[in-house]
């Protein structure tokens, strides 16, 4: 008998198949037992009629508990009333394990309780849908970049220096007793591989010990960081809007059921297409001043100050599509960003803010390629030339203009799924006060 998965049941209508999975729910009405069955690919209803199965099979069904693991064999029939639209007429039931009393029941549970039981909570329909959408986003990014000539490369997770100035580091001790740090970004190393391969990207976890307890912050999160030789600031933004559009369209096309299950209104997602609106940092500062009203919980900023999450929220509410905010002051951005030749007080960099209040999902820039300018930036930021000597070498041996960006996977998932908090975007989130499970 063929072992099939729930998502493939429409292909086997009228046939007898085997399914392997778990009991999501169970009820009995005397001579009929109803099992809501899940296997990770979907949910279906399995029905045991006392007259259709041997007595020992019907008795086995009475023992089932929530999350018991089972193997069922039976005929596939279409039933629009059943979850998933298909039903299994059970002919045989094999119990793999009877689960103990399951802690997550139909009643409402608080967030902390669910996070304490995250290893079990991820089995719920909503969490499965979110994780499938996350997978679709990840695979779409890989496919887009590969099709556009980018080579996947790896940056180290153990670093001898910090990639981003100002962010808090996780420090450990290396084998020779020198300090080492968990990576905050793969960017500096991916700049080196871009000089070897032309167009590259790295995809991996990053770690920032920021004491931020907001709906947008994780201590450990995943980033994709493309870098391309000879790319300008304009090329960089064009790549970003093309990639984000590709990802959103792919999710809408392939994960519509999951989006519907989690209750996502896709009206604005369907409007995502190039070109994205662009405003300068200076225009954004002025916009915030005009939008501010007495009694607002946020205050406008002056030119030269960085945005906070409330400012990004307000800005994104003015646009239906993701919006670029570009040309930030030099002093609020990282040392490696290329100044604008038309105005050296600002950099050729941009943040891409997702609409509906989600804020920054991408930060990117053209990088400094002039060795003397980079040396001055080292001095201004108090960076040790010996420590960053290898990075400086990239400007000594065939330096070229180049650009790149970092996209945060969790924030992107939160936006596309319409989630209140990033904690649901990854199987086991690492939050300010949560290291377990």
Curated annotation (Swiss-Prot):
Gene Ontology molecular functions: asparagine-tRNA ligase activity; ATP binding; catalytic activity, acting on a protein; nucleic acid binding; transferase activity
Keyword field contains Oxidoreductase: no
Entry annotated with the keyword Ligase: yes
Cellular localisation: Cytoplasm
Gene3D superfamilies, per the entry: Bira Bifunctional Protein, Domain 2, Nucleic acid-binding proteins
Record Pfam families: tRNA-synt_2, tRNA_anti-codon
Record GO biological process: asparaginyl-tRNA aminoacylation
Keyword annotations: Aminoacyl-tRNA synthetase, ATP-binding, Cytoplasm, Ligase, Nucleotide-binding, Protein biosynthesis
HAMAP family, per database record: Asn_tRNA_synth
Quaternary structure annotation from Swiss-Prot or TrEMBL: Homodimer.
Family stated for the protein in its record: Belongs to the class-II aminoacyl-tRNA synthetase family.
NCBIfam families found in the cross-reference section: asnS (TIGR00457), PRK03932.1 (NF003037)
PANTHER family the UniProt entry points to: ASPARAGINE--TRNA LIGASE, MITOCHONDRIAL-RELATED (PTHR22594:SF34), ASPARTYL/LYSYL-TRNA SYNTHETASE (PTHR22594)
Protein name listed in UniProt: Asparagine--tRNA ligase
Naturally occurring in which organism (per UniProt): Symbiobacterium thermophilum (strain DSM 24528 / JCM 14929 / IAM 14863 / T)
Chain's gene name: asnS
């Amino acid at each position: 008998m063929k072992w099939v998965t729930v998502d493939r049941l429409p292909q086997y209508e009228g046939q007898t198949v085997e399914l392997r999975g778990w009991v999501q729910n169970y009820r009995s009405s005397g001579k009929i037992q109803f099992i809501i069955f899940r296997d990770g690919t979907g949910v279906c209803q399995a029905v045991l009629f006392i007259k259709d199965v041997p007595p020992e099979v019907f008795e086995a069904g009475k023992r089932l508990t929530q999350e018991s693991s089972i193997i069922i064999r039976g005929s596939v029939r279409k039933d629009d009333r059943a979850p998933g639209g298909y039903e299994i007429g059970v002919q045989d039931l094999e119990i793999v394990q009877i689960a103990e009393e399951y802690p997550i029941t139909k009643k409402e549970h608080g967030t902390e309780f669910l996070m304490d039981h995250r290893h079990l909570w991820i089995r719920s329909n909503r969490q499965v849908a979110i994780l499938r959408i996350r997978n679709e986003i990840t695979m779409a990014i890989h496919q887009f970049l590969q099709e556009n000539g980018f080579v996947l490369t790896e940056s180290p997770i153990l670093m001898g220096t910090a990639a981003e100035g100002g962010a808090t580091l996780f420090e450990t001790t290396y084998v020779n007793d020198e300090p080492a740090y968990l990576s905050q970004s793969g960017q500096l190393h991916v700049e080196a591989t871009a000089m070897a391969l032309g167009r590259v990207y790295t995809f991996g976890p990053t770690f920032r010990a920021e004491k931020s307890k907001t709906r947008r912050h994780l201590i450990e999160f995943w980033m994709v960081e493309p870098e391309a030789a000879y790319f300008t600031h304009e090329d960089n933004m064009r790549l970003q809007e093309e990639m984000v559009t590709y990802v959103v369209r792919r999710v809408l096309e392939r994960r519509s059921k999951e989006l519907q299950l989690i209750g996502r209104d896709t009206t604005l997602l369907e409007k995502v297409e190039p070109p994205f609106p662009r405003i300068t940092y200076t225009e954004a500062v002025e916009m915030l001043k005009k939008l501010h009203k007495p009694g607002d919980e946020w205050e406008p900023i002056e030119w030269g100050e960085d945005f906070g999450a409330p400012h990004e929220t307000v800005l994104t509410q003015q646009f239906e599509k993701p919006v670029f905010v570009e040309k930030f002051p030099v002093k609020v951005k990282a040392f490696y960003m290329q100044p604008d030749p038309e105005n050296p007080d600002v950099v050729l960099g941009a943040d891409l803010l997702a609409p509906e209040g989600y804020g920054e999902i991408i930060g990117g820039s053209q990088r400094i390629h002039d060795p003397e300018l980079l040396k001055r930036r080292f001095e201004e930021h108090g960076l040790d030339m010996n420590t960053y000597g290898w990075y400086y070498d990239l400007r000594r041996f065939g330096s070229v203009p180049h650009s790149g960006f970092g996209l945060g996977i969790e924030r992107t998932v939160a936006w596309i799924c319409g989630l209140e908090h990033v904690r649901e975007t990854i199987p086991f989130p690492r939050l300010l006060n949560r290291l377990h499970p």
